[in-house]
Amino acid sequence: STYAKSISTYSINIDKIEIAGEGSLLKLIEERKIKLRKKGIFDEKYKKPLPYLPNKIGVITSSTGSVIHDILNRIKDRFPVKIDIWPVSVQGINSAQDICKALDGFSKFEDFERPDVIIIARGGGSVEDLMPFNDEELAIKVFEFSIPIISAIGHETDTTIIDFCSDLRVSTPTAAAEKAVPMRTELIQLILNFN
């Protein structure tokens, strides 16, 4: 019996390579960042200062889950103020549009009812889960909004486009509550030191 070894040669011609899955989302986010950065939307000079002691805080987040409870409990512990919650979907195809509608809704409040600061919050998630917060229309709305906005999207390692165009970015929803109101004891001490 005889054995013949055959050798084959293959040639692959590649015209285009595209990043698939999470890589394509990261590429899209980076392209949006470049575009918005060129427009000046991320510039520090446009950041609005947060009020030291707001009368009312608007919170845009999911009505379920730990995020809303963390924010409410932390504000209550520090310095209770009136809070208006605008529940939205924080994940999925309509989420960015829902958040834009919530901002529009807050802007239509009468002056005396309008929040002094707004927190947009969501817990952590995958790149895909956080894509609504990388939406270009939402980023522009956050940048142009007349009320200061604190973004609290995800955890320490998560950064979204609205984090760059909000007036203050914090790493967690609990941190957003801490930045929104002072500690009652700090305020009392400040008043006592003033006298």
Each model region followed by its residue ranges:
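Short glycine/threonine-rich loop/turn motifs
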Residues: 58-195
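Short, glycine/charged-enriched hinge/interface segments at domain edges or termini
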Residues: 1-86
